[in-house]
């Protein structure tokens, strides 16, 4: 009887703890990957400015990159 109660309580508890740990680990890995490999590159930012008919300064490009990396933190 005690073994059944222990199994009945420990299995769902382990599943819940595992779900929380998995969630936080996956979020940490995802954020680290987004910092290392942002969804947009400096060349893409320059081409966006070129499509608008503007020539961006290096400061504008760096500002846009900082905005994207700040967003992923």
From Swiss-Prot:
Keywords: Membrane, Transmembrane, Transmembrane helix. Its main location: membrane. It is found in: Membrane. It is a single-pass membrane protein. The chain crosses the membrane at residues 5-25. One of its GO terms (cellular component) is membrane. Belongs to the UPF0154 family. This is UPF0154 protein MYCGA5700.
């Amino acid at each position: 009887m005690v073994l059944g109660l222990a199994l009945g309580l420990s299995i769902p508890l382990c599943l819940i703890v595992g779900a929380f740990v998995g969630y936080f680990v996956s979020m940490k890995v995802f954020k680290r990957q987004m910092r290392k490999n942002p969804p947009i590159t400096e060349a893409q930012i320059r081409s966006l400015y070129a499509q608008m008919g503007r020539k961006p300064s290096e400061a504008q490009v760096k500002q846009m990159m900082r905005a994207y990396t700040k967003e992923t933190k």
